[in-house]
A protein has these predicted regions:
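Charged, terminal alpha-helix-loop-beta segments
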Residues: 1-191
């Protein structure tokens, strides 16, 4: 992907060189402490344990939709698949998320959780063009955010895609038609 260049303009113009964080946890801590400022998401929990892993960070956005954050220091790691796995888990465990929201933000917010467009924000130092194409094909609310660090005091976030997500709908396999069965009807089916 293309590289953003940052310049310090003074008496002499000087390019600021970018870098990545040394440890993924450094990036995670900075974002968790400033999640609402950076992304408009209220922070709920770090290292949220689930049955088969842990989500790096979890929060709730201004529309009361769940937001999962996954961080990777480099682009070669499997952040998108991991985020999708956690999203599916979350949709199957809504009650667990609601309890977390009650604990952190209260019942009023928990009663307003919007499950129609939950979000995964994947943050890494880069993504391939194939990553961007893949998430755009999924029709899920997955955002790819590239980060760059400039010195100790500047952090840049570049949003690489604008997801066009289909709302998650509740599907039911229960028939809505009612039928009256008698013992004779069941015996006829067995014959």
């Amino acid at each position: 992907m293309s590289e953003i260049k940052l310049f310090e303009v003074g008496t002499v113009v000087k390019e600021r060189t970018s870098s990545t964080v040394v440890l993924e946890k450094q990036l995670q801590t900075t974002i968790e402490q400033n999640m609402e400022t950076f992304f408009g998401v209220r922070f709920l929990k770090s290292e949220y344990m689930i049955t088969s892993g842990r989500m790096d960070s979890i929060g709730i956005d201004e529309n009361n939709s769940p937001v999962i954050f996954e961080y990777k220091r480099s682009s070669s790691e499997n952040v998108i698949n991991q985020g999708l796995f956690y999203l599916d888990w979350l949709l199957d465990h809504k009650a667990d998320f609601k309890l977390l929201v009650i604990e952190k933000l209260g019942m009023e917010v928990a009663d307003q959780i919007d499950w129609s467009v939950p979000c995964v924000i994947c943050i890494a130092n880069d993504f391939t063009k194939y990553d961007v194409h893949a998430v755009n094909q999924m029709q899920r609310n997955i955002k790819l955010v590239k980060y760059r660090k400039y010195g100790e005091d500047l952090l840049l976030f570049e949003h690489l895609n604008t997801p066009v997500a289909k709302p998650v709908t509740e599907t039911s396999t229960i028939s809505t038609t009612s039928s009256t069965y008698t013992q004779k009807t069941h015996l006829e089916k067995l014959a």
